[in-house]
Amino acid sequence: MAAKQPPPLMKKHSQTDLVSRLKTRKILGVGGEDDDGEVHRSKISQVLGNEIKFAVREPLGLRVWQFVSAVLFSGIAIMALAFPDQLYDAVFDGAQVTSKTPIRLYGGALLSISLIMWNALYTAEKVIIRWTLLTEACYFSVQFLVVTATLAETGLASQGILLLLASRLLFVAISVYYYYQVGRKPKKV
């Protein structure tokens, strides 16, 4: 009895079997759109993601503002810790300091915030940058409200206090602007 020989193997060409390729890609989850509307060309790019999607498109001047903020917070913190009388005198024009402890505590808090600002300067993570900008905006807003309340209580309106209030409003506006700019969704390229 003669053994039956198997039929010759037929090679499939990918150009001729498009339906098979489509089914394979669908099973692998490749080629379709994800939630963000991106089309992945391979499973690897789908798993790893597209790094353009995660890169922060920084608004013009953001890093300069972060640097200025870090220097500002550090400088005022050191001045409040080392020279509390002079800092109080510069803001409130000759009003007598009753205790240096609250001013030094203020300096310690500012020094802590400045460390966060310095670390945020070197990160590329969008969430961290936004949180530090929000922290700045909240700090400057609270400082504006506290100084305004003190001004209303004491009635001492000096040029230093008015300059401080105007600068705090400007700093709030800049921080909020960058906060929203960093949070914007990037445009599709």
Swiss-Prot record:
<protein>
    <recommendedName>
        <fullName>Tumor protein p53-inducible protein 11</fullName>
    </recommendedName>
</protein>
<keyword id="KW-0597">Phosphoprotein</keyword>
<dbReference type="Pfam" id="PF14936">
    <property type="entry name" value="p53-inducible11"/>
</dbReference>
<feature type="transmembrane region" description="Helical">
    <location>
        <begin position="64"/>
        <end position="84"/>
    </location>
</feature>
<feature type="transmembrane region" description="Helical">
    <location>
        <begin position="160"/>
        <end position="180"/>
    </location>
</feature>
<keyword id="KW-1133">Transmembrane helix</keyword>
<feature type="modified residue" description="Phosphoserine">
    <location>
        <position position="14"/>
    </location>
</feature>
<feature type="transmembrane region" description="Helical">
    <location>
        <begin position="131"/>
        <end position="151"/>
    </location>
</feature>
<dbReference type="GO" id="GO:0016020">
    <property type="term" value="C:membrane"/>
</dbReference>
<feature type="topological domain" description="Extracellular">
    <location>
        <begin position="85"/>
        <end position="108"/>
    </location>
</feature>
<feature type="transmembrane region" description="Helical">
    <location>
        <begin position="109"/>
        <end position="129"/>
    </location>
</feature>
<keyword id="KW-0472">Membrane</keyword>
<feature type="topological domain" description="Cytoplasmic">
    <location>
        <begin position="1"/>
        <end position="63"/>
    </location>
</feature>
<keyword id="KW-0812">Transmembrane</keyword>
<dbReference type="InterPro" id="IPR028266">
    <property type="entry name" value="TP53I11"/>
</dbReference>
<feature type="topological domain" description="Cytoplasmic">
    <location>
        <position position="130"/>
    </location>
</feature>
<feature type="topological domain" description="Extracellular">
    <location>
        <begin position="152"/>
        <end position="159"/>
    </location>
</feature>
<feature type="topological domain" description="Cytoplasmic">
    <location>
        <begin position="181"/>
        <end position="189"/>
    </location>
</feature>
